[in-house]
A protein has these predicted regions:
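Alpha/beta catalytic barrel-like cores
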Residues: 1-87, 94, 101-108, 115, ...
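Helix-rich catalytic cores of soluble enzyme domains
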Residues: 91-151
Length: 151
């Protein structure tokens, strides 16, 4: 962890951009790895749970990969070691299976926890926790917050 922190601190001090790429397809993943290796530049592959997820949650739409398959592929393919795996929008109800089955809040939290554990076990470097979805509650995004306070 200290090594990772030192690398990113160095990039920040050099005012270098850290590019994050959504792994939308095998071509995007391979191209990102190729560019990272060629230019010796760090690139984060930032996968949502819909793109890549644990096999117990049906994997993801990218190559039908589970978290483990995805991590193994990327780690084997990269030569420079400058590819960082990141989870984007990890959290409850962030995969299609949880939404389709309309699972309870408790089960959604357990699903997110197991997915995060799988990310950690498969060498993900960054995890974005997103708790913004609640399929059981309707939120009016167009309401004025001041109107709600006065009610």
């Amino acid at each position: 962890m200290q090594n990772l922190y030192s690398k990113f601190n160095s990039l920040i001090n050099k005012k270098k951009t850290l590019l994050g790429v959504g792994p939308m397809s095998l071509n995007v993943i391979d191209s990102s790895i190729e560019l990272s290796d060629f230019y010796k530049a760090p690139i984060m592959l930032i996968a949502s749970r819909r793109q890549i997820d644990s096999s117990i949650y049906g994997g993801g739409y990218v190559n039908n990969w589970s978290t483990s398959q995805y991590s193994k592929y990327v780690r084997k393919k990269t030569k420079s070691g400058n590819i960082y795996l990141a989870r984007d929008h990890g959290g409850p109800w962030q995969n299609n299976l949880d939404i389709k089955n309309k699972i309870s809040e408790k089960d959604a939290m357990l699903s997110a926890k197991k997915s995060f554990e799988n990310d950690i076990d498969n060498d993900f470097n960054f995890i974005h926790i997103d708790t913004s979805i609640d399929i059981h509650k309707k939120i009016n995004l167009h309401s004025n917050m001041n109107d709600e306070k006065s009610s």
